[in-house]
Amino acid sequence: MSRRRVLAGAASVALLPVAVHPARATPESMAAAIREAVGGAEVRPGRVQLEAPSLAENGNSVQITVSVESPMTGADHVKTIHVFSEKNPITTVARFHLGPRAGRAKVSTSIRLATTQRIVAIAAMSDGSCWSGAADVVVTLPACVESGF
């Protein structure tokens, strides 16, 4: 294979269309993800407390705790807790499935945040209602950075 042919091939590869992925989600894409997760049900504020640091020095590990006011009985319990981020490359951060045997509706985890943003937690209840809570987190050292985009 000649050098000329290799260079021509490399140039043609550079001209191929590249799939473009958004570097981060948007508030609109987060709203769409929430609608999809709750099946179009109305999401009301309240009953959900999202604890997160107001300032996170490192976006690679941000500790959050979500608790929901619920008696956690067979008739009235949290079925699912969804966590969404406004500006991460992927909007849905976490999903927890609970039942009455969980005892209490409280989950904790560490998440990665790409930048300063709002985090929203949605609790889907056994009666079909959905409740929300939110927290704003300022990130000084971002995570979730995808090179090449």
Enumerate the predicted regions with their spans.
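N-terminal secretory signal peptides and thylakoid transit peptides that target proteins
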Residues: M1-P17
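Transition segment at domain starts
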Residues: R24-N60, F96-H97
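An anionic, turn-rich surface loop/hairpin at beta-sheet edges
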Residues: P89-R112
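Extracellular Ig-like/FN3 beta-sandwich strand-entry sites
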Residues: A114-R118
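Short acidic/polar inter-strand loop motif in beta-rich domains
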Residues: S126-S132
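Short beta-strand edge segments in extracellular beta-sheet folds
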Residues: D136-T140
